[in-house]
Amino acid sequence: MPRVKRGVTARARHKKVIAAAKGYRGRRGNVFRIAKQAVMRAGQYAYRDRRNKKRTFRALWITRINAAVREQGLSYSVFIAGLKKAAIELDRKVLADLAVRDKAGFAAIVQQAKAALAA
């Protein structure tokens, strides 16, 4: 059986890892062994943070809605309860966007929620 020479394959593998580590500081960007570890760790961080991003954005939306609703004289939890009673099915992303971009429209929604709470 002939000997398998892996020069081309190894070079390609190394180039792929070094390319993925482009921009890293020091030996993390140009020494294969260290770059490989850095790229693996970066992948773990990316995987974890793709999940955390959903939490972070939801928290941001809730904070924005809460701030806008308090200007109207309600708290966030009471406002959400009012939306449920009024059968308004807007998600937090849309509500936060309205609170930032369309204050009049958001105020109208808050009034509907208040009316549903009073009824």
From Swiss-Prot:
The keyword Kinase does not apply. PROSITE patterns: RIBOSOMAL_L20. GO terms for biological process: ribosomal large subunit assembly; translation. CDD domains: Ribosomal_L20. The lineage of its organism: Bacteria, Pseudomonadati, Pseudomonadota, Betaproteobacteria, Burkholderiales. GO terms for cellular component: ribonucleoprotein complex; ribosome. InterPro entries: Ribosomal_bL20, RIBOSOMAL_L20_CS, Ribosomal_protein_bL20_C. NCBIfam families: rplT_bact. Pfam families: Ribosomal_L20 (PF00453). PANTHER family: 39S RIBOSOMAL PROTEIN L20. Binds directly to 23S ribosomal RNA and is necessary for the in vitro assembly process of the 50S ribosomal subunit. It is not involved in the protein synthesizing functions of that subunit. GO terms for molecular function: rRNA binding; structural constituent of ribosome. This is Large ribosomal subunit protein bL20.
